[in-house]
Amino acid sequence: AFRFEAAEGRLQKIPSVSTIPDSIQERTGFSTAEIAIHPSGKFLYVSNRGHDSIALFGINEQSGKLSLKSVEPTRCQTPRHFVIAPGGKRLYAAGQASGTITAFTIDSKTGRLSFNKRILKVPKPVCIVFSRPISSTPKKP
């Protein structure tokens, strides 16, 4: 992990952290995939393939240091990608191997995820994107 030193215009290396709880010893086949920072800038989320979870880290505003807060099961297999919805209140995880998208509510104070008990069947989802509505009226030059 790195912290950007704006005054000097350089990156400073900061210690790496595990995205899997220390209690998990066997990690064969585990890898991280998506990384996203909550719009508040206070929380960082990382998806874990193999462990099928999303790790939540708190971000220290002064040092940029990460501290593991929780690891939430995604309730889908191989969470290749996830997205934080505009507004920062929801997170959606794409389970490539399970063919599902699962939904979570984000606690605005703690960043913790709560499963919404919503599972959408989709053939091999690998990415979720929110976009703005497309206007049918052309813009004037």
Stretches with model-predicted labels:
Residues 1-141:
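Feature marking well-ordered beta-strand scaffolds used for ligand recognition
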